[in-house]
Amino acid sequence: MRLCIADPPYLGHAAIWYGSGMHVSKLSPEFGGTARISGVKPADHHPDAARWDIIDTHLAMVERLISDYDGWAIAMAHDNLRAYLPLIPASVPIRVGIWNKPQNLPGGARVLNTYEPVIVRIPEGRRASTGCAIFPRDSVTISRINNGFPGAKPPTWTRWVLDMLGYDPEIDTVDDLFAGSGAVAAEIAQGVLDLGSAS
């Protein structure tokens, strides 16, 4: 089966994290705060990142995933879920997984955000429990990594998503639409499911 993991620049965050506004924090003076961000741009700078702040760019990606893949997962910011759900036709079966990130730092909101949703389309024939060797949960708690790439996912996150998709290295191919740090591709290359990775 053809599977895909899509971890695009998050809607409403792309220009700030990856584009020309990379050093403009919502806590910065431009937004009425006092935070100062300094340092060099991370390795994942893209001059056209702002196009991912437009919902139609995400819609085109969703349409591609639906037409080209048997199963897929889309990572997103907590405030993106409301925008994404209407992009997916009701006839397309999906699940929403939750990645809990226990060590997040305070942002501009009073309520601390500690999770990111992942929309998953589990391939046909892999949704029922019949004949399953593993039963992944739809939520997982995994610490973030700080490797210089904004939004990089830890290896265990990739394992969890692959487990939800029912990944079988003998018969499946997996595309990583946004290679970024290379962490997703590195985990896919291992090929063997770690049955205890995401509990």
Located regions from the model:
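Class I S-adenosyl-L-methionine-dependent methyltransferase catalytic core
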Residues: 1-175, 179-199
